[in-house]
Curated annotation (Swiss-Prot):
It comes from the Bacteria. Belongs to the TrpC family. This is Indole-3-glycerol phosphate synthase. GO terms for biological process: L-tryptophan biosynthetic process. It catalyses: 1-(2-carboxyphenylamino)-1-deoxy-D-ribulose 5-phosphate + H(+) = (1S,2R)-1-C-(indol-3-yl)glycerol 3-phosphate + CO2 + H2O. It is an enzyme of class 4 (lyase). PROSITE patterns: IGPS. PANTHER family: INDOLE-3-GLYCEROL-PHOSPHATE SYNTHASE, TRYPTOPHAN BIOSYNTHESIS PROTEIN.
Length: 271
């Protein structure tokens, strides 16, 4: 299973990074940054304080546009790769937020890509990686991320609950990714405020937009619902809007487009 390989590789990467920069050091720096920004363990949770949540809860279908160089299912997606240029195209095209892959082995991502993008855009940035430890959440804060991805299928309920608490204390939103009914219910029980439904099965990599349409009814209206993967036409986005979806994560369709601004506008044409 490719997901299991990614998880094992990520564990090794975290251990190497911890040897270079111990967790107590990175935790202290991230916590101090959050306190300066008005967050911390005693701060109250208000959606408008969290940049990513405020943006993705706006009326209509909000576009979370992804920057990724490669993927296990498609191989190399973008040989000529300039993440800052792509991010600016996304922002000018009407993206609400940007997702940046930082996983280096299977997606050829880099932490530097996120830092560079964050400096150049005025919209929220999501760190998309395979988060297995709190260490990576502290990293995300220091990289400048506004949001992190938490994948239900690779975390225990105890981990997910704990990571959501850390995110709140750091002023980070958490997009909690699910794929089926059981995972959606687990995410909600753990306190997730943003539910993502991946239309791609991470075990088989098969894609079906019906997954988002089917699971939308399980998520309360006060939570943010984001449909992820396999979205490539204005008709699909119109259908998702009618189902009450708040946002869509679009990656490969945009990464392969020669004119990304035009592609975003085309995808929005039926809204």
């Amino acid at each position: 299973m490719i997901l299991e390989k990614i998880v094992e590789t990520t564990k090794d990467r975290i251990n190497q990074e911890k040897r270079r920069l111990p967790e107590e050091v990175i935790k202290k720096s991230a916590t101090e940054m959050a306190i300066k920004q008005g967050f911390g363990s005693s701060s109250s949770i208000s959606r408008d304080k969290f940049f990513f949540e405020e943006v993705m809860s706006r009326p209509g279908v909000n576009f979370l546009c992804e920057i990724k160089r490669a993927s296990p299912s498609k191989g190399m997606i973008a040989k000529d790769f300039d993440p800052v240029f792509i991010a600016k195209e996304y922002e000018e095209g009407g993206a609400a937020a940007i997702s940046v892959l930082t996983e280096p082995t299977f997606f050829l991502g880099k932490d530097d890509y996120l830092m560079e993008v964050k400096k150049e855009v005025g919209i929220p940035v999501l760190r998309k990686d395979f988060i297995l430890e709190a260490y990576q959440i502290y990293q995300a804060k220091l990289l400048g991320a506004d949001c992190v991805l938490l994948i239900v299928s690779i975390l225990t309920e105890e981990q997910l609950t704990g990571f959501l608490k850390i995110c709140d204390e750091l002023g980070l939103s958490a997009l909690v990714e699910t794929h089926n009914q059981e995972e959606v219910m687990r995410a909600l029980q753990c306190g997730a405020r943003i539910i993502g439904v991946n239309n791609r099965n991470l075990s088989t990599f098969e894609v079906s937009i019906e997954n988002s349409l089917k699971l939308r009814t399980l998520v309360p209206k006060e939570a943010i619902f984001i449909a992820e993967s396999g979205i490539s036409t204005p008709e699909q986005i119109k259908e998702l809007k009618e189902a009450g979806v708040n946002g869509v994560l679009i990656g490969e369709t945009l990464m392969k487009a020669s004119n990304k601004k035009l592609m975003i506008r085309n995808l929005k044409s039926l809204l």
